[in-house]
Amino acid sequence: MLYLEDYLEMIEQLPMDLRDRFTEMREMDLQVQNAMDQLEQRVNEFFMNAKKNKPEWREEQMTSIKKDYYKALEDADEKVQLANQIYDLVDRHLRKLDQELAKFKMELEADNAGITEILERRSLELDTPSQPVNNHHAHSHTPVEKRKHNPSSHHGATDHVPEKKFKSEALLSTLTSDASKENTPGRRNNNSSSSSNNAYNTNSSQPLASYNLGSLSSGSGAGAITMAAAQAVQATAQMKEGRRTSSLKASYEAFKNNDFQLGREFSLSRDSTGYSSSALASTLTQTLSSSSTDSRSGRKSKNNNKSSSQQSSSSSSSSSLSSCSSSSALAQELSQQTAVIPESDSNSQVDWTYDPNEPRYCICNQVSYGEMVGCDNQDCPIEWFHYGCVGLTEAPKGKWYCPQCTAAMKRRGSRHK
């Protein structure tokens, strides 16, 4: 799991490279602007003195002005080329980041199926600001903005700590404590239940956040996986919201399209917690659907009876999760109220999806990746093509036209004959 360290090492020089190129671009921009101002002044002087001088002088001045204009145009083109190089540099690093994220998610899924969904859902929950609960009816009319800047005195000293940071620290402390107590199976139930309750009692409106990653696997590598998950949550919590949610949207789209289902691959230690995979899958499905902003009315279902039973089992599981205070009571309630959910195929894998708003290119209608070649036909509807899709292994010499434009040019040539 060295993807993060490798990527950070790769982009270590990126800020300095961008700064140097932006500085160079700014210098070229000023150079072009100064040249245009001088040329404008020379043109005005030329027209003012044109009638007083000989035709030879006018021709000489006109040639000199045109030459300087072409020089300014070349500088402007060079500035545009530099901007394109900067864009390609950043885009290449973004694609590399997407690839490393996909590898990291697959490595986590190989050890614990479904762990990335829980981590990403918790990250979104940390991003979502929750309104502070005010128990006094006398202050119920106070606006939310005012309560944020003027906290009540009855909340104590913890009001000075941001809620998002507090919940992140509580989550990380729970994960690390579960990982350290993995080797004591006799006290696993008590430790997991007590740490879970202590960590998430601060937010009673989210009872489903009290899952224990320490109980995800009972194998010898469970402690390492839990520690890796804790580090992943910590790194994700420290990222900016824009960059963090970009990769999460793809996972939620895959989950909503039934490309990914939690089944028996979600290996829980049944000897310690007694959770059933179907109960946890139904609970996660209900939680994900309730947090999504998309409407359920537009979704198509193949079997209405199965979907209704799943929704009822999810609601009952959610109510039991919020009412139980210990893991043993939670396991007993879930075992009595859950229904059977169709399990996903064990060989199914999560397909890495790109941003749906990213433009598509080439005859394969896919996003930009790898080496691409541009069609020299200005009216080409596709414009950019992958090397492999058009049978290229290196950059073509001279002008290059795509197969569609080549066929169209041949048809036009045959008509003229």
Swiss-Prot record:
Residues 128-203, 286-320 are annotated as: Disordered. The keyword S-adenosyl-L-methionine does not apply. One of its GO terms (molecular function) is zinc ion binding. One of its GO terms (biological process) is chromatin remodeling. Zn(2+) 2 binds at C375, C380, C402, C405. It is found in: Nucleus. Belongs to the ING family. This is Inhibitor of growth protein 3. It comes from Gallus gallus. The gene is ING3.
